């Protein structure tokens, strides 16, 4: 039985698959398929990403050979990312991916110092592999390394949860099944970091003294219209434990509301432990020492009584 398939996007052929299925009397059929990708657009995957949490751009090229039994096929070949980027508007981050080929050898996707850039010249590199030999339970074993990496360099927008500049050193490992990864390592926040976090669910409420009497709202003024709940990015079943060193010169600011009129500013350092659980809980445990003081800016602040 022969197979011939192709995929067009905007009237342009972007994927071709040719091959044959070889049935046997034992029922353990085998196959031989060659697939070619030519400028396969990754943005078509954006429709499957909920709430546009991240946006893919760029093309994928490459050739794949699929052989062996239909129950346990072997995949070999290479994939080339052509100007591929991943944008997260909430976190103001745009990651640019290496254009060097990524090899697929016997169902292993191999990363050889695969580089990811943002706005700086220093890359974030990945070494290791993702193993698909057991299709029901793909496994990963990856080493992550970055030195003086520009993790964030973004201005504030209406969608921002984090903005400012973050520079970091990172050395970490990621291992385990893709639906339950374990990440361990060290993160060093460098002294030129100046970052702000927008607190969307705050127990502190900023309130005008006349707010309980009358409120005038102009629907053409987008700053006074009720803001829709901002979707958050989930990291799936990731179990992360990172030892963090924060340089004493690091500046961290927390916007207590979307107006940017009420904020807390911290300057200091420490060595806390950062944990992220598979349930989505993020905690920091340890000592943080103020070196440049604490600044609180607000109009009228109401604290909860319970």
Sequence positions of predicted segments:
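Interface amphipathic segments
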Residues: 1-63, 71-78, 82-170, 177-301
